[in-house]
Curated annotation (Swiss-Prot):
The keyword Protein transport applies. It comes from Staphylococcus haemolyticus (strain JCSC1435). Pfam families: SecY (PF00344). This is Accessory Sec system protein translocase subunit SecY2. One of its GO terms (cellular component) is plasma membrane.
Amino acid sequence: MIKKHEYKILYKRILFTCFILIVYIFGSNISIVGSEGIYDNKDTFFKLAVSNVGGDLHTLNVFSLGLGPWLTSLVIIMLLNYRNLDQATKQTRSEKHYKERIITIVFAIFQSYFVISTYIHNNFIKDSNIILLMLILVAGTMLLVWLADQNITYGICGPMPIVLTSLIKSLFNNQHFFKLSVSVLLLILVIVTLVIALLILLFIELSEYRLNYKDIMNNSTNKTPTYLAWKLNPAGSISIMISLSVYVLLNNMINLIATLLGSNANFEFLSFANPIGIMFYIVLQIVLSYLLSRFLINTKKKADEFLKNGNYFDPIRPGRETERYLNSKARRVCWTGAILVALILAVPLYSTLLVPNLSTEIYFSMQLIILVYISINIGETIRTYLYFDRYKQILNKYW
C-alpha cells in the first residue's frame, strides 16, 4: 500500500514535469524572427553553451536566452551569501526570489541586447524593433525561470529536465555530425575517449568521501559504523550549467560594452577558438564548482549540529575545532571533484584546437558527456524522492 502511494506521488511529479517540457518545446518553436542559422558557420560552442542552459540560437525564439541569466544570478547571490551562510538560511523564500528575479532581469536585458545586436549586424532584422524584441526575449526568460521554479516545487529536478530537452534538441540540430569524413582509427579513438570520460564521470558521481564519527545515541552491542558522507563532486552537473552561463554572459557583456564604446578591439582570445579563452573557462569552472560545493556542504552548519547532538570525531573537540577539521576535509574533497570535472571538459576543448576540422564532432561528444551527467543526476534525484516518500509519514511526525 505504501509502495503504491510513493509511486503515485512520483508519477504525479513526472507528469507535471512532462507538462512543463511541453510548454518549453512549444515556446522554443515560436520564432520571433523569420531567419535561421545566425551562428551556423561560426562559434559552434556558443550554441552549445547556450543549449546547456536551456537556450536555443538556431533560431531567435521566445526561449532563446534559456536559463542563463537566472543561473548567473544564483552565482551572484551565492557569492554574496558565502561569507554569512547563517543569515542566508534565515531569508524567506520571497526574499530570495525577489533578489533572484531583479538580478535575472538585469542580466537578461544585457544578453538580449547582445543577441539582437548580432542579428542586426548580420542584416537579419532592422534596428527599429529592437526594444520589442528585447522585451519578448526578457519575458520569455522570466517565463522559463518561473516554469523551472514550479518544477522544483511540483515536478522533479528543477531546471535539469529543461536543459536535458534543450541538449537533445541541439544534438538533433547538429546535422554536420552525421556527415563524417574521417578515418576509422580516429573515429574509434574519439569513441574510446568518450567512453572513458563517461566512466570517470560515473565514478565521480558514485564516489563518496566518508568521515567516521562517534554517535552517542548508538548503544547497541553490534555497533553499525556511523559516518558523514560527501560526494566527490557535491555540485554535480549544475556546476557545468552555471559556469557556461557565466562564461557566455561575461563574453556577451564585454563584446557589448566594446560595441557601445565604438571600439574595434578584437576579443577572439575570449572565445573557444583560442587557448586563453579555454583556460579562462576551465579556471571559471573549477572556481565556481568549488564554491558551489562548499556552499552545499555547509561545514559550519554541520559543526553546529554535532555540537548540539553530542556527536564527535575522535579525537577532535566539538565546536570550532570540529569546524576547522570539517573545513580542511571539505577543501580537499571539493577541489578534487572540481578539478576532475574540469579536466574531463578540458580534454575535448583543447582537442578542437589540435584537430580543428573535427571541432563540431568533438563539441557533439562534449554535449553527450554533459547530457549523460545530467541524466545520472536526474536518476539519483528520482531515487531520493522514492526514499523520502517511503518514510514521509515518520518524518512528518518529528520534522
